Amino acid sequence: MKKTPLDTKRLAKIIGQTPTVGSEGVVTFEVPRKDPIRLGGTRINPSLNVATTVAFEPLGSRSAVVVDFGMVSAEIQGLIALMRSMGWQVGCLYNQETDEYPQLYWSYQFKAGDPYALAQQVRKGLDRLDLDA
């Protein structure tokens, strides 16, 4: 695993998944949904861009955190309202496939600050979704 100044074990405990560490110490988590995802009738692996992604970029004692939440329609309003109430910037809401089941929608969200406090906020968002974490 590449090096990062972030405590990956502490972040993993909060997020509930094992991270990868990429270039410049960016720590990334992929959090799959509980329900199987089908694309064109074929069950696909969550790592094929159908998992919520959480990335922490170290910035000294702070981090920039970007989350790409994967949601079904019934989860959108509650998740976005929660994250906005905690000061997250909602970058967009979109869908990328037309033939997946269940139909997924995505929302990029961003905030900078203490990485572990932000991880706790992300956890609150993840808890609103039907995820496997």
Residue positions per predicted region:
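Long, contiguous binding/interaction regions
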Residues: M1-L104, F110-A133
